[in-house]
Amino acid sequence: MGTSALWALWLLLALCWAPRESGATGTGRKAKCEPSQFQCTNGRCITLLWKCDGDEDCVDGSDEKNCVKKTCAESDFVCNNGQCVPSRWKCDGDPDCEDGSDESPEQCHMRTCRIHEISCGAHSTQCIPVSWRCDGENDCDSGEDEENCGNITCSPDEFTCSSGRCISRNFVCNGQDDCSDGSDELDCAPPTCGAHEFQCSTSSCIPISWVCDDDADCSDQSDESLEQCGRQPVIHTKCPASEIQCGSGECIHKKWRCDGDPDCKDGSDEVNCPSRTCRPDQFECEDGSCIHGSRQCNGIRDCVDGSDEVNCKNVNQCLGPGKFKCRSGECIDISKVCNQEQDCRDWSDEPLKECHINECLVNNGGCSHICKDLVIGYECDCAAGFELIDRKTCGDIDECQNPGICSQICINLKGGYKCECSRGYQMDLATGVCKAVGKEPSLIFTNRRDIRKIGLERKEYIQLVEQLRNTVALDADIAAQKLFWADLSQKAIFSASIDDKVGRHVKMIDNVYNPAAIAVDWVYKTIYWTDAASKTISVATLDGTKRKFLFNSDLREPASIAVDPLSGFVYWSDWGEPAKIEKAGMNGFDRRPLVTADIQWPNGITLDLIKSRLYWLDSKLHMLSSVDLNGQDRRIVLKSLEFLAHPLALTIFEDRVYWIDGENEAVYGANKFTGSELATLVNNLNDAQDIIVYHELVQPSGKNWCEEDMENGGCEYLCLPAPQINDHSPKYTCSCPSGYNVEENGRDCQSTATTVTYSETKDTNTTEISATSGLVPGGINVTTAVSEVSVPPKGTSAAWAILPLLLLVMAAVGGYLMWRNWQHKNMKSMNFDNPVYLKTTEEDLSIDIGRHSASVGHTYPAISVVSTDDDLA
């Protein structure tokens, strides 16, 4: 027998004798459970946490056999029944022991409130933060925290409204109802303006230099009227071919013209439109829009006003416990089943072997929890906190998958769940909401010519910065107590201290042509902004001395922007065609789309860092939505033509989302999970554009890796956080201004405007290489490198002497490569196509090339920084 035949016989015998896997079919063996599971004697798999927990989860009780008596850890509280729970759950107002002993009066009556807390009374074990007293909300179960509060006393520079609310004295007699009860506009004398001011028709005053400058500063545009200026104001906006220009100056998509939904501020896109009628196969909503007829009464609000789901009838009338559906299709009352009379055409209501038999009497019907006997047959049910994973077996419900079931942190337990709060928050037992501990949170928003603040608890309403021109974007560095805003008229970004009563502000960044939004990186001390005119996203240091384009391609109408310096990502919206929300590293790498479907006009975005979600407003769809930070798990929070008529910007804090609506000129708030509990916080605004929450917990502290080992990370220009994709991701990378590349050392900058000339000199036989650079920005010193390369004499015969040796070397190399190719074909190989893996491994191989001693940051060797900056130049 030949060698090949022997090998074949040996392989056949090995296959026949090889033991089969335990999960193979046809062996009769039980399926193998996961390492995190326990296998019952009957083969069922349960989570390992349920073994020896005192509760029989296997039908045969095998999970509670041979169990050693459990001992609680030192950090646990021992319940009276022996159960262990974390000590922090003791006396928190929520019974966690099955016997409730963690909340017993014996355990909790001696509870001592911590510093900065107050007791809810002699007969209460509840403690609340001092800042929650007299905040207008009942936080104690007894409501004692809101008793004997008295009237709020306003400061000398504030006005007390009839309702007791405090507002800035600058709001009194300004022609707007800022108290919301009109008391700030009572008994007002006719307003007068200064010698160098112009009085608008609304009685407000503006500098005389702002009149007839083609920029309406009066809310009624009287400073640019034909009567005042002798001409119509010149509208400088020029829209691209895919857009139309509104009468009020802005640009919108052509396809939005005459679609029944006003998108222009003045509604000019819906003027002189032909009357619309829906096709026969369509349903006409009450607002005049058309949807496909199949979408009517489908259980989903397809019309913005929800009229497609009104007066819908349930076509299936055979629902509920009092009905029985025959196999032949009829629907009869359950009382007619097993009454020895034919009510179904096929006699399916009178099965001989199933009527008057209680299957639950034998082995509980095979049900793991509850067996319910029915007139015909039976059904299995589960205890609270459990659900059927098949028709008989109950498994734990993961309640934490339900949005909003907990305010912040949800811990899934067997048959239930536990809610907790993040650091800096405390749970309000009355509402279950995690509320911030410390100073009162407030909303700060732009109002065109000023910046205002309203407290979220006491509703104090004041003016922070006044005498501005056209404020459109806003953010803050809360730790530094600084505000940053962009002014459209002055094409610049400004800064001011939030507690500066004088109102001084400084121009930080100039030549910002059409700033749509700004976002402050509070960890690395930089600022990001979108520019709708130049179609760019830029980044700069907070003092404005160093700046660059981060992205200047594939942007149509960049709008809102948000940053997460803790993970190194920046997010922005773009309402161009096609509209989308994108995500990228804050250093300009790893750009990718986040939301691309069912999105039309994403005006505002904001991040919920605690829940790791992104929220956005769609002004065209009149919708507030959210996704996780990978673009998954999309949810619609609110859809409303009334409260989301033309939303512009939004922000999130605790369990509330707040937004500005441009058409209603108001600030609204709602529950961020459900969109319920709608409330109006401020109205009668004047072209408000942006809004933020001001509280220390909005910007969690983080480590600035650029200052960890050396100043600015050793970078010559900008040091920017890198996206934290995996454990191998660098903490930061160096970045250069537009027109410059990062050198191989990963730190220094080199001009991309380099020209190379060759000049041959007979005397030295060398070629001179000279570099000519363009304009060098401040702070960048680019040195010109000149090298000499020896040129061999012409006509030399030295090359002929080494030619045989060269041919021999080439033959040896060729033979080696052929051997390598043969060896490669006879080896097992593994392909790694995952781009993240490829990028990571390439980085690991190149991490130490030309890098300083700090190991936390480096450039991306696998993705050339040079080519990226070339694209941005």
UniProtKB/Swiss-Prot annotation:
Q: Where is this motif: Endocytosis signal?
A: 832-837
Q: Which UniProt keywords apply?
A: Cell membrane, Cholesterol metabolism, Coated pit, Disulfide bond, EGF-like domain, Endocytosis, Glycoprotein, Host-virus interaction, Intellectual disability, Isopeptide bond, Lipid metabolism, Lipid transport, Membrane, Receptor, Repeat, Signal, Steroid metabolism, Sterol metabolism, Transmembrane, Transmembrane helix, Transport, Ubl conjugation, VLDL
Q: What is the effect of changing P129 to A/H?
A: Complete loss of interaction with Semliki virus spike glycoprotein E1
Cite the EGF-like domain residue spans from the record.
Answer: 356-395, 396-435, 702-750
Domain LDL-receptor class A: start-end pairs:
31-69, 70-110, 111-151, 152-190, 191-231, 237-275, 276-314, 316-355
Return the annotated region ranges for (Microbial infection) Interaction with Semliki virus spike glycoprotein E1: 117-139
Outcome of D94I? Complete loss of entry of Semliki virus into the cell
Specify the effect of E137A: Complete loss of interaction with Semliki virus spike glycoprotein E1
Task: Outline the segment boundaries, as ranges, of region: Clustered O-linked oligosaccharides.
Answer: 751-790
What are its GO cellular component terms?
Answer: clathrin-coated pit; glutamatergic synapse; lysosomal membrane; membrane; plasma membrane; receptor complex; very-low-density lipoprotein particle
Q: Please give the PANTHER family that the UniProt record associates with this protein.
A: LOW-DENSITY LIPOPROTEIN RECEPTOR-RELATED, LOW-DENSITY LIPOPROTEIN RECEPTOR-RELATED PROTEIN 2-RELATED
The UniProt subunit note reads as follows:
Homooligomer. Binds to the extracellular matrix protein Reelin/RELN. Interacts with LRP8. Interacts with LDLRAP1. Interacts with SNX17. Interacts with DAB1. Interacts with PCSK9. Interacts with PAFAH1B3 and PAFAH1B2, the catalytic complex of (PAF-AH (I)) heterotetrameric enzyme; these interactions may modulate the Reelin pathway. Interacts with STX5; this interaction mediates VLDLR translocation from the endoplasmic reticulum to the plasma membrane. Interacts with CLU. (Microbial infection) Interacts with protein VP1 of the minor-group human rhinoviruses (HRVs) through the second and third LDL-receptor class A domains.
Q: What does this protein do?
A: Multifunctional cell surface receptor that binds VLDL and transports it into cells by endocytosis and therefore plays an important role in energy metabolism. Also binds to a wide range of other molecules including Reelin/RELN or apolipoprotein E/APOE-containing ligands as well as clusterin/CLU. In the off-state of the pathway, forms homooligomers or heterooligomers with LRP8. Upon binding to ligands, homooligomers are rearranged to higher order receptor clusters that transmit the extracellular RELN signal to intracellular signaling processes by binding to DAB1.
Q: What is this protein called?
A: Very low-density lipoprotein receptor
